[in-house]
């Protein structure tokens, strides 16, 4: 059994802490995926639908949660009940019967009252007594309350219940009472959902409504305030969550409070109106969601479908190794998908071109390597049958020559094969061609003392009075390789006695031009384009066979094109139309487009 040492325990604790830290750094999108499942996010169409519908749900939820319709409706109902209560209280006060034999009115006390002060008698003050006669008030209260669904209760000066509109019946009225169910009511899922929905949208805590036991109105704060002459309103909620709005209005006669009129809405009246308003919002939400889904599907068809076609085409390109697969063309869209389509088409074309180039290069390499190998094989097979020392010496020289030729070919092929990768990895930097050309010409002049001695001139064409910039972005070694190849190529074709090579640097708009011109025999018209082909050689008779691989000009053009430039060849013709030499022109994009 493996026992944990303190070191292993501490290491495991550190690992657990690091794992805990990684768990705490979970991306929010990962959390959403865990909640809703990966299926929601497995397709761009489903993502568009999910986020668009989610945005609509959040919007409607915010509207329902922050909607002020309910509060406005409650305020309007309070004002309506207060106005209605003032009218009913005035009618009740006018209908109250006063027994003048048992009332003593002190005029001086009336004159001592201030504005707004009530003459409600104190418990030990029996100077003023205005009793309300329920029998005379009941018909008036019933007629005023009947057109509305408002409940009215009348309390006397001691907050005792005198009348309740629930128990006021007119003559001939048929009474109907709902009996309680035989079995207790069970809450359905619909009722539970509605209750939870209302609780979420009505988070404010309201006092619970209770019936006054024994008609004692003192449990209602608004009734007690009304006994002091101040009207008030209170909003309560029943056990079922239904709203009840109550207002208390003092019943006054001769500025004396005779009692209190308490008006209350029926439980659920306001909730029904709010529910209807929310139902209308939900209908609009349903229509908006349906429209959102349709628009999301249309949006998905314009985004996901083209992307799906591009993806399928890319897979066909990967699998179709022998045939050229066509990438769908969405360039007419003129948007990001159109740009992606153009990029994929160009990338695919470049890929196929590269495949063709590799196949062609492999075929050329195979062909070029077979020639020296065939010669080498023949020499090796013939060497044992050679009878004279002279024949053996000549065959040995052929073998050495073919080996050197193979070595040169393999080196040039290796250089050409890794050229693209090297240019892709290396970072281009600003390079002054004027400085580079001067250095290359100086080196070539020094080489002339060891090889064929020819005159090499360098000319930088600048505008009068201006300092022309010859700066380009590139790789100095590779651009130097182009110019060196052109100079050495020209050296091989000019005569040693009168040979001359001119390197000229100039600027044309946003291009830097390097020209290498010689006074040799020129180029055959049919060979001007072929000289840039791989392994093509057309060397002067003075050079031995196999001294050149034929890759120099091909590599030079490849380097120029990798820098966004070009390399071309032409003949120099004098005024008589006679070819007087060859000219190679290297064009590179300038790093700056202005002159300073």
Curated annotation (Swiss-Prot):
In-chain residues carrying the UniProt-annotated modification Phosphohistidine: 367
Transmembrane region(s): 48-68, 284-304
Subcellular location(s) of the protein: Cell inner membrane
Catalytic activity from the UniProt record: ATP + protein L-histidine = ADP + protein N-phospho-L-histidine
A GO molecular function held by the record: ATP binding
A Pfam family: HisKA
Lipid bilayer topology: Multi-pass membrane protein
Residue span, Histidine kinase domain: 364-592
Residues exposed to the Cytoplasmic side: 1-47, 305-596
Periplasmic topological domain: 69-283
Protein name: Sensor protein ChvG
Species this protein is from: Agrobacterium fabrum (strain C58 / ATCC 33970) (Agrobacterium tumefaciens (strain C58))
